[in-house]
Amino acid sequence: MNIIAIMGPHGVFYKDEPIKELESALVAQGFQIIWPQNSVDLLKFIEHNPRICGVIFDWDEYSLDLCSDINQLNEYLPLYAFINTHSTMDVSVQDMRMALWFFEYALGQAEDIAIRMRQYTDEYLDNITPPFTKALFTYVKERKYTFCTPGHMGGTAYQKSPVGCLFYDFFGGNTLKADVSISVTELGSLLDHTGPHLEAEEYIARTFGAEQSYIVTNGTSTSNKIVGMYAAPSGSTLLIDRNCHKSLAHLLMMNDVVPVWLKPTRNALGILGGIPRREFTRDSIEEKVAATTQAQWPVHAVITNSTYDGLLYNTDWIKQTLDVPSIHFDSAWVPYTHFHPIYQGKSGMSGERVAGKVIFETQSTHKMLAALSQASLIHIKGEYDEEAFNEAFMMHTTTSPSYPIVASVETAAAMLRGNPGKRLINRSVERALHFRKEVQRLREESDGWFFDIWQPPQVDEAECWPVAPGEQWHGFNDADADHMFLDPVKVTILTPGMDEQGNMSEDGIPAALVAKFLDERGIVVEKTGPYNLLFLFSIGIDKTKAMGLLRGLTEFKRSYDLNLRIKNMLPDLYAEDPDFYRNMRIQDLAQGIHKLIRKHDLPGLMLRAFDTLPEMIMTPHQAWQRQIKGEVETIALEQLVGRVSANMILPYPPGVPLLMPGEMLTKESRTVLDFLLMLCSVGQHYPGFETDIHGAKQDEDGVYRVRVLKMAG
């Protein structure tokens, strides 16, 4: 970061000559100099090049107007105003809070001024670097000799082996030097929350609006377990979203608690809806508790916010309404909601404390922000037992945490501070909105069919669009007012074949075909449903990637309309079974899968499968204890009715458990099995379209098998 922008020249000797001298002195200090054409050019440069570290300008020509414009982009950026003896200094106390320094035009002063600008630049970099990351950078630069872990010793060991050299060259020296031991006392301790690690947690809490934050280096799967192990003691009852991540299902297996399920909705497209308001009422919870063996009034509740498909709750209403002392929002997919006004009141940490309640929010920092994989955060607001919570934290945290992951979490937080952070999130929102409008435009201009987007008919402005009652676009029956909202950065593309109400057309294009087409062209889809594809517009998505996706969609339409051979359009799929696909064309494949889906009435089957819950014979914990004692056997998936499942069974997508350990399918819930068998049949008919079902294993004979508990006697 060594770029300084100079506004000029000015066409007068007494101004231009000192600036020329200064340019030479700054180059000698290691700076790179650029000369924007005008203020518009400068602002565009600052907006698109965060490596700039200073701006030099003439005060008489630009004054506070330019400073204010720059501050809207980055209020921390050093600004250097040059004045003469006649300049008017109309600067208020508020203005002096800017990173603004004044220098007089004078010959022979360039070297001293350049040294000062180097100092101010160093202060700027120090100011924007968060505490733990700063300490880690300093430690790496010191190049100390260590006789502790890790064994690669800052990468030295890798360079003693040919293959190790390949590894070292790929990842780079600093990455390996930053992988240090907990024995380095000046970096503090993640487990004891001391030193720079403590400073990092305090810094992150301030940034995200929490009272306390914890850094977790092995994913939100672990963060969820930490919160659950603390908040739901053995023998207690846990109120939990059935639309939960499998890590929470694992928590139920680990912890001897009784789950009481909050049942969410879903529409005919298979898009996950939220939990209706009625489910949060005291009357509804009392009914659930009364109907569940061993259940008591719940001590803790877990809600997935947002859903996988991007639906956010009115969390303020839930926090005030849900009569449970401890509420956990699993917000793995939305770590950015604190940083844009459209998300106000839709996150766990929004608003003030709620009397008598503690609010937890877990976030996968790596999913949508700029952090390394497995980077996660736990945010807390409210009274809690810090010592007991830290025991749960240490129970699930390695004693050799990855310091690069810690630094990446902290840096992700630092990137969101101030105007630069607001701009990052706003750019993602605006880019997603622009993409949505482009798809709409292409659909209107297209000859014949084109893709659609799951959204309200009009999306003129960036907002979280309400899933309002009576509206057709979302496809949810009996939607509640002011309850669920669609996140604009979660973009769901719809393919022809079925509308939001589940009405199927004569012809259709299953989304799996589009996903395979895009994948073979280097575009990876986040989630694929029967007739929809989910794309995430994170802060790392730029215009190039967005246009690449748009181009991929238009290329698919062109290839589909030409009815190309599978061999030419989807060569990787063709390679799965050349004999099967030898003479097949894309429209034949699309209509074949579409007819299979129509035959099984997928929309109705899917709705019924998720609407009727299986019978809980025992808790997931009790079922797990039976399994580790070996009291299990393997049966064909089609024989599952009447047997108690040993594992959770969930098809991906969407990755939501259909069957939990300890649950049994009955005649009333048999549609769960019918739905699973229907998913299996697609892969049996069309090679390359096998469904990934967690908890079910496909053997060489093509039969899916599952583990169930042995029957008594």
Predicted features and spans:
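Extreme N-terminal starter segment of soluble prokaryotic enzymes
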Residues: 1-3
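Short beta-alpha junction loops
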Residues: 10-12, 60-61, 82-89, 108-109, ...
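Non-catalytic terminal extensions of PLP-dependent enzymes
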Residues: 13-30, 39-57, 70, 76-77, ...
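Short, structured coil segments at secondary-structure junctions
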Residues: 29, 75, 95-98, 255-256, ...
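Conserved PLP-enzyme active-site core in the AAT-like
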Residues: 36-45, 58, 68, 220-440
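A short, gly/pro- and small-residue-rich
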Residues: 64-87, 378-380
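Long, structured ligand/cofactor-binding scaffold of large enzymes
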Residues: 163-254, 260
